[in-house]
C-alpha cells in the first residue's frame, strides 16, 4: 500500500476517534525490550497528537520475578496469582514504580509527549480489598492459601485521570491499589486496565500482548472480529486457554461494563497499534457487539 493510501485510509478513523479516550495495556516482551517499547510509545504519542486521550496501564510480572530471583527469593503462584508477602510487595513496588513506570514516562517525553507516572494507590485512584483465601488441591486434599497483599478491585476514582487527560497529559499507571485502611495491594494489570476503561467511559480497551490476537483451534488464523459471546464460547470450549484466559476475561468484563470496543494485538511488531486502529482490516482481534461503528 502506498504511503498516501495509508494516510487516506487513516483519516476517517482519526476523525471518528478525536476526543475519545482509550486505555492501552502494555505487557509481554515489549516490557523488557526497550526498542520495541520505544516504538509502541511513539505510536501512543501519535494517537495523542491527533486528539485521542490515551491512558497507559503497564504490567511487570516477569521483571518482578527476575528481581526476586536475583535477591534469592523464589516466586510463588496460586491460580496464576502471585503470592505477595511483605518482601514481594516491596519488590513489586520497586520494579513497577521505580523502574518500569519511570522508563515509560521517559520514553513518552523523548517522543515529544507529556506523561505523568502514577500508581493505583495515588489519589485513591484504585480502591481494592484483600483477596479472599484461594482454594487449591495439594496431594488429593483441598487447602486454602492466603495470597498476602493481593487485591481485588472494588472502586475506581478517575477524577485525577480526567484532569490529566483534559490537560493533554498521558497517565502511565502501575498496577497497585490501596484498601480503605490505607494499605497497599498488588493487583492484576489486565483487570486494572479493564476497570479503568469502564470508569473512564473509554471508547476502546487495547491489550498488547505477545500473540497476534485470539487464534482459532488449529492456531493457523487470527479472528479479526468477534462478539463477546463468541469469546465466551471459545473459553468454554478450550480454544482460549492458559495465559490468554485472564486477558480475555478482563476484556469481557470491560465490554459488559459499557466499553464499546476491545482489541487484543501483538505488541512486539512495529506500529501494530496504529495499524489496528487506523486500517479497515486491522492486525489483531477486535471484540464488540456493535455492527457498523468502530
Curated annotation (Swiss-Prot):
Q: Which UniProt keywords apply?
A: Amino-acid biosynthesis, Arginine biosynthesis, ATP-binding, Cytoplasm, Kinase, Nucleotide-binding, Transferase
Positions bound to substrate: 60-61, 82, 186
User: Would you tell me the Gene Ontology cellular component terms?
Assistant: cytoplasm
Q: Where in the cell is it found?
A: Cytoplasm
Q: What is its EC number?
A: 2.7.2.8
**MF terms (GO), sorted A to Z:** acetylglutamate kinase activity; ATP binding
Example of a GO biological process term: arginine biosynthetic process via ornithine
Give the pathway annotation: Amino-acid biosynthesis; L-arginine biosynthesis; N(2)-acetyl-L-ornithine from L-glutamate: step 2/4
Q: Which protein family is it in? A: Belongs to the acetylglutamate kinase family. ArgB subfamily.
Q: What's this protein's function?
A: Catalyzes the ATP-dependent phosphorylation of N-acetyl-L-glutamate.
**Name by which UniProt lists this protein:** Acetylglutamate kinase
Taxonomy of origin reads: Archaea, Methanobacteriati, Methanobacteriota, Stenosarchaea group, Methanomicrobia
Amino acid at each position: 500500500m502506498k504511503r498516501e493510501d495509508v494516510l487516506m485510509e487513516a483519516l476517517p478513523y482519526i476523525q471518528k476517534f478525536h476526543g475519545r479516550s482509550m486505555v492501552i495495556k502494555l505487557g509481554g516482551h515489549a516490557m523488557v525490550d526497550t526498542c520495541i517499547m520505544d516504538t509502541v510509545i511513539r505510536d501512543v504519542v501519535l494517537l495523542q497528537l491527533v486528539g485521542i486521550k490515551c491512558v497507559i496501564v503497564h504490567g511487570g510480572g516477569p521483571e518482578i520475578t527476575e528481581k526476586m530471583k536475583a535477591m534469592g527469593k523464589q516466586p510463588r503462584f496460586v491460580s496464576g496469582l502471585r503470592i505477595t508477602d511483605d518482601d514481594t510487595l516491596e519488590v513489586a513496588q520497586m520494579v513497577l514504580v521505580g523502574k518500569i513506570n519511570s522508563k515509560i514516562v521517559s520514553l513518552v517525553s523523548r517522543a515529544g509527549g507529556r506523561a505523568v507516572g502514577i500508581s493505583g494507590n495515588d489519589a485513591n485512584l484504585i480502591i481494592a480489598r484483600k483477596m479472599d483465601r484461594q482454594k487449591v488441591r495439594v496431594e488429593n486434599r483441598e487447602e486454602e492459601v492466603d495470597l498476602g497483599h493481593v487485591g481485588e478491585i472494588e472502586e475506581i476514582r478517575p477524577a485525577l485521570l480526567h484532569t490529566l487527560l483534559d490537560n493533554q497529559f498521558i497517565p502511565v499507571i502501575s498496577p497497585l491499589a490501596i484498601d480503605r485502611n490505607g494499605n497497599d495491594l498488588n493487583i492484576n494489570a489486565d483487570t486494572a486496565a479493564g476497570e479503568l476503561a469502564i470508569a473512564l467511559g473509554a471508547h476502546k480497551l487495547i491489550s498488547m500482548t505477545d500473540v497476534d490476537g485470539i487464534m482459532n483451534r488449529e492456531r493457523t488464523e487470527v479472528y479479526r472480529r468477534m462478539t463477546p459471546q463468541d469469546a465466551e464460547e471459545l473459553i468454554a470450549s478450550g480454544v482460549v486457554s492458559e495465559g490468554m484466559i485472564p486477558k480475555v476475561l478482563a476484556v469481557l468484563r470491560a465490554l459488559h461494563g459499557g466499553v464499546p470496543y476491545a482489541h487484543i494485538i501483538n505488541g512486539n511488531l512495529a506500529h501494530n497499534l496504529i495499524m489496528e486502529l487506523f486500517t479497515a482490516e486491522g492486525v489483531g482481534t477486535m471484540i464488540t457487539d456493535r455492527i457498523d461503528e468502530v
